[in-house]
């Protein structure tokens, strides 16, 4: 409730930023909150990841410390959706649609994967549709300066090769070129 004291306190502790979640609306009051949060975190040189928020609408142009915005039906939804989207197809739509608006906190990187016919929503042991390689590719395809790992630490410890790959992927790129793609079918992206 006292945003300035919270930001000051955590900045003094050496914390580098916040991931704020569960805003889940886009009315004027919430928009004002997001601007206050961006302004206050900038004042204390803190990064800001606005999860559970509408797609970006320019806030990060005024406050570059606001580095991520969810604004997407992220991978976490696979834990509880009774009628999940066709996730594989969805993931090759969002780079063409949502990604155009700016950085996206999608929370990819699932290590438990299943073919569409074997997939089921499970809150206690979440999984994703498709392959693990597809999950890894999302770290390159999706623009996200502050990537999250969606799975449990023990799953990444068991899959060290995947963890090493994710750790080596830059989060900021000098150039991005979509070489080819078809909405809902595939995307080929080159970054350097």
Where do the PLM segments sit?
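Alpha-helix initiation and N-capping motif
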Residues: 103, 134-135, 159-163
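A generic structural micro-environment signature
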Residues: 73, 110-112, 117, 142, ...
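Long hydrophobic segments that form regular secondary structure
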Residues: 116-142, 147, 182-184, 191-192
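Generic structural hydrophobic/aromatic packing signal, biased to beta-strands
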Residues: 41, 66-69, 106, 138-141, ...
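Glycan-recognition and catalytic regions of carbohydrate-active enzymes
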Residues: 151-192
């Amino acid at each position: 409730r006292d945003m300035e004291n919270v930001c000051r306190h955590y900045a003094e502790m050496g914390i580098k930023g916040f991931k704020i979640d569960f805003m889940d609306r886009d009315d004027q009051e919430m928009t004002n909150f997001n601007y206050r949060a961006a302004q206050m975190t900038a004042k204390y040189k803190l990064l800001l990841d606005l999860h559970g928020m509408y797609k970006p609408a320019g806030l990060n142009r005024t406050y570059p410390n606001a580095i991520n915005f969810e604004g997407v039906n992220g991978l976490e939804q696979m834990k509880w959706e009774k009628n999940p989207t066709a996730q594989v197809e969805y993931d090759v739509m969002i780079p063409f649609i949502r990604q155009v608006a700016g950085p996206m906190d999608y929370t990819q990187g699932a290590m438990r994967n299943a073919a569409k016919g074997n997939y089921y929503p499970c809150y206690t042991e979440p999984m994703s549709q498709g392959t693990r390689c597809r999950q890894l590719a999302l770290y390159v395809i999706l623009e996200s300066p502050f990537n999250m790992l969606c799975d449990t630490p023990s799953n990444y410890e068991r899959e060290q090769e995947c963890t090493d790959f994710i750790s080596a992927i830059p989060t900021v790129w000098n150039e991005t070129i979509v070489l080819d793609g078809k909405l809902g079918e595939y995307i080929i992206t080159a970054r350097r």
